[in-house]
Curated annotation (Swiss-Prot):
GO molecular-function term, one example from the UniProt record: metal ion binding
Single GO biological process annotation from the record: L-beta-ethynylserine biosynthetic process
Pathway as given in its UniProt record: Amino-acid metabolism; Antibiotic biosynthesis
Enzyme class per UniProt: ligase
NCBIfam families per record: PAGG_GluLig_BesA
Catalytic activity field: L-propargylglycine + L-glutamate + ATP = L-gamma-glutamyl-L-propargylglycine + ADP + phosphate + H(+)
Superkingdom to which the source organism belongs: Bacteria
Protein name in UniProt: L-propargylglycine--L-glutamate ligase
Function of the molecule: Involved in the biosynthesis of terminal alkyne-containing amino acids such as L-beta-ethynylserine, that are produced as antibiotics by S.cattleya. Catalyzes the ATP-dependent ligation of L-propargylglycine to L-glutamate to form the dipeptide L-gamma-glutamyl-L-propargylglycine. Is selective for L-propargylglycine over norvaline, allylglycine and the standard proteinogenic amino acids, except L-cysteine which can be used as a substrate to a lesser extent.
Length: 482
């Protein structure tokens, strides 16, 4: 039930979600996507910098952080986080830096970061010693993986996102759909049956055509958790399939080469769903299951999609859907908790005409908005409340807009210090005294890829959008040289 706008303030321990007063935390945001994604999306290499949202944990004098990134963190990026985002004062900075270690693996291969770490014996030994220095050790990972499980065994640290075998089963497309059905959350037409041949998929699409979900198109989703951002989805024209019987030849949208799709279908399987034509909104809910099994709804967002892929979000989600999203996320989390999941999870929804809110995917990992809400809570100094709102010290709501910018020609000419100082000079960088402005993330990708993320916070949605537009124009447009 929604509250009456109570501000959820945090003490120092709660503010940064700290639970282990004497601990070593290894921050490793490894993206265990298919190799094709890691090769073709260069900024993913720098997205490990999202883990810098946890630097506030250094307020606890018993905590040591070891941050692992694919590329070295620029000193200006670190300085921006410590001073501007988390506001460590000068007397505290020396001790904070002493308890902070930044590491990169020796290999620069386009493979998941945790795999590269595991292959670096010297780095693993450094981590093992760091964990041994304190009573407890945690791996703050983006998602579960075999490499992270093994890294936990070799260092003595506990991965935050649980066991990979569990996540592979229940975080797959079929597993997620089954979870939603168990939780009583509405989903698109189709079943959670895993199909492993083109003939089985064709038959499932024909069966779907005969049911109540008689849309013109169907969606085939590769089942494995490695296929994210809709890369493993294939949109099928049902009429064409009915006349030709050729699955791949009937595809309106397919992002993989035909042979790779067929190989993945045979090895990992796929599910078939109706394709929803009348989508007006794409909200999402983020939850977390504590070690004792308690389910917490963290936040609800409206997603900004580009080509079916996540490209940003707005907070909070539309109030028309927020209570229903909150309830669905909680019920989904209760099913997951009962099965044994611990850690983060996200549920993606669509609003489909008269059918309303439908869950289309579950992710048993941190998700696109995970670091965003953590940055926002750190900047504001409060958690999202039971009413689904984030409020400042004065009790007024705070809204934010998060987006990704990929402009190689212009952003590629900037470095982290220049980007931060340009926003500061124009009064756009987030100011703690006003509670408004723009925060920057993944600054390391500026020079290399022309990519950066920004989150604009303000006291109204319109003002947040205005800050975001102004910051984007400033970073990508002409600017007088000093």
């Amino acid at each position: 039930m929604y509250g009456a706008g109570v501000v959820t303030r945090m003490n120092e321990a709660e503010r940064f979600h700290m639970t282990d007063p004497g601990s070593t935390k290894i921050l490793i945001y490894a993206f265990n996507y298919a190799d094709r994604m890691l090769e073709e999306v260069p900024y993913l290499r720098y997205s490990a910098e999202r883990s810098l949202c946890f630097l506030g944990d250094l307020r606890d004098p018993g905590t040591r952080l070891v941050v692992i990134t694919s590329e070295a963190v620029d000193p200006a990026t670190l300085d921006y986080h410590l001073r501007d985002v988390f506001r460590f004062d000068e007397p505290a900075l020396a001790d904070v830096r002493r308890r902070l270690t930044l590491l990169t693996p020796a290999s620069r291969a386009a493979r998941p970061l945790d795999s590269l770490v595991l292959e670096d014996e010297a780095l693993v030994e450094t981590l093992r010693r760091a964990v041994a220095e304190r009573p407890a050790g945690t791996i703050v990972d983006f998602s579960a993986s075999p490499a992270t499980d093994e890294l936990g065994r070799r260092t003595g640290a506990t991965p935050e996102e649980g066991d990979h075998a569990f996540v592979a089963r229940w975080g797959s497309k079929s597993g997620g759909k089954e979870i939603c059905l168990r939780a009583g959350v509405a989903v698109p037409g189709g079943t959670s049956e895993v199909l492993r041949s083109e003939a089985e998929v064709v038959e499932a699409i024909h069966r779907l055509s005969c049911g109540t979900a008689a849309a013109r198109r169907a969606m085939v989703k590769l089942d494995a958790i490695t296929w994210a951002a809709s890369i493993g989805n294939v949109l099928i024209d049902r009429d064409k399939l009915r006349h030709t019987g050729d699955l791949v030849g009937s595809a309106e949208v397919i992002r993989l080469p035909a042979e790779e799709f067929r190989r993945e279908l045979a090895e990992q399987g796929a599910i078939v769903e109706e394709f929803l034509e009348e989508i007006t909104d794409s909200p999402s809910g983020l939850g977390h299951i504590e070690r004792d099994g308690t389910v917490r709804v963290v936040a609800c967002h409206d997603q900004v999609l580009s080509g079916g892929q996540y490209w940003g979000c707005r907070f909070p989600a539309d109030e028309r859907w927020r209570p229903e999203i909150t309830d669905a996320v909680r019920r989904t989390g209760e099913v997951l908790s009962g099965l044994g999941h611990r850690g983060a999870f996200g549920v993606d929804f669509v609003v489909a005409g008269e059918r309303g809110l439908l869950a289309v995917e579950i992710n048993l990992r941190k998700v696109g908005p995970s670091h965003v809400v953590r940055y926002a809570e750190a900047l504001v100094g409060a958690r999202v409340g039971a009413d689904g709102m984030l409020r400042g010290a004065d009790g007024r709501p705070v809204y934010y807009t998060h987006g990704r910018l990929l402009e190689p020609e212009t952003l590629g000419k900037l470095n982290p210090r220049t980007a931060v100082e340009r926003l500061r000079a124009e009064g756009l960088l987030y100011r703690h005294d006003t509670g408004e402005g723009v925060a920057l993330h993944v600054l390391g990708a500026l020079n290399a890829c022309g990519f950066v993320e920004l989150t604009a916070l303000a006291r109204s949605p319109e003002a947040a959008d205005g800050y975001s537009r102004a910051a984007q124009a400033l970073l990508t447009g002409p600017y007088p040289s000093a």
